[in-house]
Amino acid sequence: MSNLERDPAELVATSAVLTDADVEILEPRDVPLGGPRAMTVRRTLPQRRRSLIGGWCFIDHYGPDDVSATGGMRVPPHPHTGLQTVSWLFEGEIDHRDSVGSHALVRPGELNLMTAGRGISHSEVSTPGTRRLHGVQLWVALPNASRDVEPFFEHHTPVAGSIGPASVRTFVGSLAGSGTSATVFSPLVGAEIVMPADTTIEVPLEEGFEHGVLVDAGDVTIDGTPVPVSHLAYLNPGRTSLSVSSGADARIVLLGGEPLGEQIVMWWNFIGRSHEDVVAYRAQWQGEVIAGADPHGRFGTVEGYDGTPLPAPELPSVRLRPRG
C-alpha cells in the first residue's frame, strides 16, 4: 500500500500516554487513501514521539469497510526502497502485481511479503467480488547492511497455534507454535491473536524485543491498561510475557523486534539514510517511470495494471530529518 498523504513529510503529532503500568498508548490518526470516495486508514506508526518498534516502521489499520459502493482499494503502481511491505487481511481480497513479475492475491490468513530492497514498484487493487475490506498494512525498515538487496516477493500461509482459548496466526517469526519461514533481515515477530469474550491470556515475549499491540476489536486491557480499538500499545524491551484480557470477542495484532539501532529517513514510499537518498529516489521514479525514460531502471514496470503509475508528491521545502 502506498502512503498517499499530500504532505508525507509531516508526521502529525497524536497523543502518546505513558500509563502507570509503563504501557504507552499511541492514538491513531485518519489518513484518506486518495480521493473523496477512497477508503480511510487509521495510522499509528510513525509518529513524532515514536518512529520504530524493532524494524516495524509503518502501521495502517483499515476497515471493516463496505467497499462495494466506492470501488474499493485501487492503488496505482508506486515505488518503494529500503523496506519490506507486509500485507495481512482479516476480510476481503486484494490483487497484487509488482515489477519483479509477481502476481498474487492477498487473502485473510495469508501473508504477502514484498522486499523492496534497492527498489521495486507495485500496484494493489481489491478484487471485484470483495464487498468488505479489513486488515493491516505494515512496513519493516531494512537494516543499513541489507537495504540495497535485490527486490523479491514471498507468499506464506502460517499454521494456526494457540495460547489457551485464543488462536494465533504468526505471519513473521514464531509464537505459540505458529510461524512462517518469511525472509526478514532483523529479528521480528508479527502475529494475529483472536480471543473469545471474557478471557485472559499470557502472551510469551522475547525479552530483548520492544513490542506493539494494535487492537482491532474487543474490550482489551494490556497488563491492566485499557487500550481502545485502533490504538497501539507500546512496551519497552525487558518483558518476558504480556497479560491480555477482553470482555468481548477480540482481535489484536502483536508486533515486535530487536531495536533497530539505526536512524532512517522516511518520506512518501521511500526509506533511505539521508535527505539526499530520498531526493535521488524521487528523481529516479519521476524520470524512469513517470516520464517513461527507462522502464527497466531501478523501479521496473508493473505488467498487467490498467492505468498509469502514481507520481511522487513535491518534496518539502526543508531537509528531511533522520528518525529512529
Where in the sequence are the language-model features?
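Jelly-roll (double-stranded beta-helix
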Residues: M1-G324
